């Protein structure tokens, strides 16, 4: 989706399952819903779909509204790539320090 040189995309809902950031339906959403949303973004001409990366949850008041379900960025993008053809897939945030470089 481009308008005068601008490219438009979206960050996937569902992926974080964080109650403070999510719509009420998202906590019941499945991986299949991620695929459905990504395919819809592709079909409607979005240039990209992004996912974010957090595998460590802060120990604060904000965390009380978060779940521990955060899909792995690389695995999520790989899975979505197998179900799409033209939409660009990107990591909005990817924290390399969360992962051991040799594992």
Language-model regions, residue ranges each:
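Short, small-residue-enriched loops and turns at beta-alpha junctions
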Residues: 96-99
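Conserved catalytic cysteine-centered active-site region
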Residues: 84-92
């Amino acid at each position: 989706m481009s308008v005068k040189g601008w490219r438009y995309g979206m960050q996937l809902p569902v992926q974080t399952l964080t109650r403070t950031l999510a719509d009420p339906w998202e906590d019941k959403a499945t991986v299949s819903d991620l695929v459905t949303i990504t395919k819809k973004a592709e079909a409607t001409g979005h240039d990209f779909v992004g996912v974010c990366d957090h595998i460590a949850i802060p120990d604060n008041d904000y965390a009380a509204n978060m779940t521990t379900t955060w899909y792995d960025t690389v695995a999520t993008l790989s899975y979505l790539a197998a179900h799409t053809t033209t939409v660009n897939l990107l990591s909005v945030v990817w924290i390399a320090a969360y992962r051991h470089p040799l594992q």
